[in-house]
């Protein structure tokens, strides 16, 4: 489940390295995008906010490794699909719903750079269906089951996902061993692991309340 990481701005189409979900968790939970996320959310003008995000935020292509960020330059699919939910009035409720869903395992879940949306990363089996078919199937499932609308732009395999700061970012428990390896060489290990433990406790409490 490896994919490409790109440095800002968005017009930079050549990736600088290949990373994994635990790497993204470390980035989002750590201080790397904290200031720019705060600055973005302070901008009242939507056009200025969009320009700031496109010029200042690093990003990934969750669905694969690329030579360049175009569908034609896909080197290897990651077997991951990232679904965007924009302009949510009930963000915390949607977060709880996604984490409690038993059909799709949530591998990573975090608040979007704007602060009013969510990014949901799940695994897909390309032997069963293509990337676009999976996107359509998942979108239909979300709409029918939860009345949630997925951003249609996510059907593109080269879809860029900006990386914000979210100290409550969720990562699947089965990825914790790999995450610990990623964190071992970094000074912020203790703080990140404490944040992770607190987040998992909150998720467990929310799931218990929904039963």
Where are these regions (language model features)?
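Short Gly/Ser/Thr- and Asp/Glu-enriched loop/turn motifs at secondary-structure junctions
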Residues: 111-118, 155-160
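DNA replication initiation modules
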Residues: 4-12, 67-89, 124-211
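Signature for HUH/AEP ssDNA processing cores
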Residues: 1-116, 124-137, 201
């Amino acid at each position: 489940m490896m994919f490409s990481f790109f440095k800002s701005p968005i017009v930079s189409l050549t990736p600088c390295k290949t990373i994994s979900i635990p790497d993204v968790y470390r980035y989002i939970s750590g201080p790397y995008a904290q200031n720019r996320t705060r600055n973005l959310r302070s901008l009242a003008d939507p056009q200025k906010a969009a320009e700031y995000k496109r010029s200042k935020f690093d990003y990934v292509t969750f669905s694969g490794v690329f030579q360049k960020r175009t569908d034609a330059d896909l080197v290897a699919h990651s077997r991951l699909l990232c679904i965007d939910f924009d302009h949510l009035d009930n963000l915390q409720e949607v977060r709880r719903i996604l984490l409690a869903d038993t059909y799709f395992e949530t591998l990573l879940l975090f608040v979007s750079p704007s602060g009013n949306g969510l990014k949901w990363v799940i695994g897909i089996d390309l032997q069963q269906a293509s990337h676009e078919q999976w996107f359509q199937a998942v979108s239909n499932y979300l709409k029918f089951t939860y009345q949630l609308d997925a951003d249609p732009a996510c059907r593109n395999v080269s879809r860029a996902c900006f990386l914000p700061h979210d100290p409550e970012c969720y990562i699947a428990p089965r990825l914790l061993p790999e995450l610990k390896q990623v964190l071992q060489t970094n000074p912020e290990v203790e703080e990140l692991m404490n944040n992770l433990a607190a987040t998992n406790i909150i998720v467990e409490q929310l799931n218990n309340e929904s039963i």
